[in-house]
A protein has these predicted regions:
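N-terminal glycine/serine-rich phosphate-binding loop of ATP-dependent small-molecule kinases
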Residues: 1-95, 120, 148, 222-223, ...
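Short acidic-aromatic active-site loops that bind/stabilize oxyanions
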Residues: 43-51, 124, 128, 207-211, ...
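Short beta-strand-loop/turn "lid" adjacent to the catalytic site in phosphate-handling enzymes
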Residues: 59-97, 125-129, 160-181, 206-211
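Structured loop/turn residues at beta-strand edges in well-structured enzyme cores
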Residues: 68, 202, 390
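Active-site core segments that coordinate phosphate-bearing ligands/cofactors
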Residues: 5-6, 103, 110-122, 133-168, ...
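Residue-level signal for inorganic ion chemistry
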Residues: 23, 46, 73, 99, ...
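Short linear loop/turn motifs
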Residues: 202-212, 319-322
Length: 501
């Protein structure tokens, strides 16, 4: 029986997953990536480390199924950030999408009015880790690096390049990173000039549909990964959109929530709307788009808590924390948590914090606050989607939070809508694999691929009215605390800037 290989390169982990054509997972392997933080606000991963992680994961995955007959490969990768090769296609620099070094550049674009003009073309708000903002920052602050650049890629494009030898990009990543001008459905000199990057247009890769075959596994890649030479490789897909596809969300009006490193909240729409004041718009297929509200405020907060405050137990953080959270009874005096470890929706100054702690509170109480605070951050994004006229009555949940026995129900209770959970825990890799299947003609489009390969848990989680009534006033207090802290966060940032000067 034939298999598809999906690769998912996030900010913290690279995974390789073998799927049967019905979406059954046959083998999974992962390689943790190390984030280099040479200065506060920096988050880098060398391009060579990304490729080494990919080869390690693929080899380990194939070793679990030596008789696998892989017929196509697709990669998904975290959006934004910046991965550059020099003119000889050698690795130059890799910056992740939780990097905040360019916050001052994003603020400058807002203050000068350029951000509004950028949104009118890209439908993407400027922010510190977006690819063109980082590139503009490097042009000013690291001109030597900028002058050496030959190609500016997204994370999954690096993987596709080293597998196939080709330089390529796709529309989902280009749109999600603020590089695509929706007026022309491609790059434009006018948009690049708004970032002060008129000279950088030729650094960007040719754009393809996510399912387009762009090359084949090279002899060198075959030697390093164990994949047979000549297998087709598709352009690949932005991991946010890949997770939606891997959750079965591809039709207009359907909604996907991804609770991983990022809080991803997205709705499939027929066309982009310049009047919607939302964070990001991406492309899912030629005739469909993804309206997205997102920030780095989700389940990665739990990874940090479990890592830094270990309790001696082994296992997945979400799984082993759930039993403690389940013991916590609703109480108005429980602490609250702002999940802004990696900045957050309020731009760079926002910081994480527990509020309302007392001497009787326990580890379980703090974990409850963290679970709830992450879910509140998702609600804030969903409220903005609703305010933009993109209301939805149910959603499909994927990501790290689904490994918890109770977190998905908390999403239903906090959001007040029914939640379905994708059965596959590797939805990003599955979305990439479905793209590969479409690329080699297994299915005519993503919708048919989803029909054949995606399965949802048959149980729909309904919101509990009493729990919703408990969380609702706490959400309002969560927002009031955020507003109260805002001036202090900005003052801290100003003090840091003065110190650096």
């Amino acid at each position: 029986m034939s298999q598809l290989l999906g690769i998912d390169a996030g900010n913290t982990m690279i995974k390789a997953v073998l799927f049967d054509l019905d979406g059954t997972v046959r083998a999974v392997a992962s390689c943790a990536g190390e984030t280099h933080q040479p200065r506060p606000g920096y988050a880098e991963r060398p391009v060579t480390d990304v490729w080494q992680g990919v080869t390690t994961a693929i080899k380990a995955c194939l070793a679990q199924m030596p008789d696998a007959e892989v017929i196509a490969v697709g990669a998904a990768g975290h959006g934004n950030g910046l991965y550059a090769l020099d003119r000889q296609q050698c690795p130059l620099i890799g910056i992740q999408s939780v990097d905040s070094r360019a916050a001052d550049r994003a603020q400058e674009l807002e203050q000068t009015g350029a951000a509004a003009a950028i949104y009118a073309r890209s439908l993407q708000k400027v922010w510190a880790s977006s690819t063109p903002v980082l590139l503009s920052w490097l042009k000013r602050h690291d001109p030597a690096c900028y002058q050496r650049m030959g190609h500016v890629l997204c994370a999954k494009d690096v993987i596709t390049h080293f597998l196939s030898g080709e330089i390529s990009g796709d529309y989902s990543d280009a749109a999600g990173s603020g590089l695509m001008d929706h007026r022309v459905r491609g790059y434009s000199e006018e948009l690049m000039a708004l970032y002060d990057l008129a000279d950088a247009r030729l650094l960007l890769p040719p754009l393809h549909q996510s399912c387009d075959v762009v090359g084949q596994i090279t002899a060198k890649a075959a030697q390093l990964t164990g994949l047979p030479q000549g297998i087709p490789v598709v352009a690949g897909i932005f991991d946010v959109v890949a997770s939606a596809v891997g959750s079965g969300v591809v039709n207009v009006g359907e909604a996907s929530i991804v609770a991983g490193t990022w809080s991803i909240n997205q709705v499939v729409v027929a066309r982009p709307d310049y009047l919607r004041p939302i964070f990001m718009n991406s492309v899912i297929e030629r005739d469909r788009y993804m309206a997205i509200e997102a920030s780095a405020t989700s389940a990665a907060n739990l990874d940090w808590f479990v890592r830094e405050f270990a309790d001696g137990r082994s296992g997945n953080g979400a799984e082993r924390s759930s039993d403690l959270v389940a013991q916590v009874l609703p109480d108005a005096h429980l602490p609250l948590y702002h999940p802004y470890l990696y900045s957050g929706r309020k731009e760079e100054p926002a910081k994480a914090g527990f509020y309302g702690l007392s001497g009787w509170h326990t580890r379980a109480d703090m974990l409850f606050a963290l679970f709830e605070g992450v879910t509140f951050a998702h609600r804030a994004h969903i409220d903005r989607l609703r305010a933009a006229g993109l209301a939805f009555t149910s959603a499909t949940l994927s990501g790290g939070a689904t490994r918890s026995g109770i977190w998905p129900q908390m999403f239903a209770d906090v959001l007040g809508i029914p939640i379905r959970v994708a059965e596959c825990k590797e939805t990003g890799a599955l979305g990439a694999a479905i793209c590969a299947g479409v690329g080699v003609g297994l299915w005519p489009d993503l919708a048919e691929g989803v029909n054949q390969a995606v399965k949802l848990n048959p149980v729909t989680l309904q919101p509990d009215e009493a729990r919703h009534a408990f969380h609702d006033p706490r959400y309002k207090l969560f927002k009031k605390l955020e507003l109260a802290m805002d001036s202090l966060w900005h003052q801290e940032l100003n003090d840091q800037n003065v110190t650096e000067i």
